[in-house]
Amino acid sequence: MKTNVLPAENSAQNTKATNAVLGKDVMEAVWADMALTELPSWVSDVPPNWGTPARGKLSANNWRVICTVHLPITLIRLWGGDDTPKPWRDFLENFMDLVCAAQIANLRSISKEEIKLYEHYIFRYVTNFKSLYKHSKVKPIHHAALHYGDILRGFGPAHTHGGAFYERYIYSMQSMNHNMKFGM
């Protein structure tokens, strides 16, 4: 049975005022779907109360699982129907462009064709972001994401040059003795 959770008619004005797309009803639908979703053993569980003040901050891996697994499951169910009003269908398509780009950017191996596909999705995401979220500003991370195809072309898959690599490098540098002082 399809449940179509869309904001009330006057919520469009509230959405612009609060900069929020996911309201309480949508969040409750996500949490309900999470309780019914069986994840493979290699996918980390996320806190069931994410998105609430009581929960606090989430790890990058929590956000990855939420945005690439849980939100797509619920948002496609809620906003993916032919009868979904245009703005909400557009929000879904824009979010799915971001999900596709993120999935491609995090592949363990990557081809030239996949890099072009990444560039297609991220360009469409940023372009449509500007028209869908007129009240929001394009951030430096959006600009950086548009250049990430060049980074993938030059340095290969993200895991070879991602944060974990630099964390290990920084740790090894801090472990060395520099001028008789630790951590310099």
Locations of regions flagged by a protein language model:
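A structural signal for the principal folded core domain
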Residues: 1-184
